């Protein structure tokens, strides 16, 4: 998409207007494989912003879901067990100002003058889901890889870490 004279919140968290056009170009690919009860679902988004300081986007975002699905009791109880994974390449990302309740285009640098970035960290969930007649139940260990890969450098927004590992149980029907 192409926008002109885009209004955004700058690094100082004040409204700013970009003079000129900003283009965000993306390419989305989806490919699912099924081999018997094994499901391999893939989603990839490649994107480019002509003005990262105005519209920061990661170069690539990937979502993978690998699970095995089978009948425990045919026609009555069906079960899925698998992993979900999400990954974004590193990019400048956004900051959040709670005083104004607004995300802003953050530009922060470390002591060496290197731009502080978010992303570059895989987020993996382990899940089991069952369908019994009309009722569904799921158990999910979100952020399974917490503290296992890359220390604790997992942020989606600057200074706001992603959730730690936790167990989630649900009964939708």
Each language-model region and where it sits:
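Exposed, low-structure sequence patches enriched in small/polar residues
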Residues: 1-173
């Amino acid at each position: 998409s192409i926008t002109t004279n885009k209004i955004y919140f700058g690094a100082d968290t004040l409204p700013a207007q970009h003079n000129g056009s900003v283009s965000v170009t993306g390419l989305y690919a989806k490919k699912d494989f099924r081999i018997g009860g094994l499901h391999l679902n893939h989603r990839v988004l490649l994107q480019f912003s002509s003005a990262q300081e105005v519209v920061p986007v990661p170069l690539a975002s990937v979502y993978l879901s690998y699970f095995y699905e089978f009948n425990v009791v045919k026609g009555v109880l069906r079960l899925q067990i698998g992993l979900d994974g999400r990954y974004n390449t590193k990019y400048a990302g956004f900051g959040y100002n709670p005083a104004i309740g607004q995300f802003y285009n953050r530009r922060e640098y470390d002591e060496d003058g290197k731009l502080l970035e978010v992303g570059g960290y895989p987020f993996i969930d382990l899940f089991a889901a069952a369908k019994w007649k009309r009722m569904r139940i799921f158990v999910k260990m979100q952020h399974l890889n917490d503290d296992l890969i890359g220390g604790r450098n997992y942020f989606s927004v600057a200074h706001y870490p992603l959730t730690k590992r936790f167990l989630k149980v649900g009964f939708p029907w």
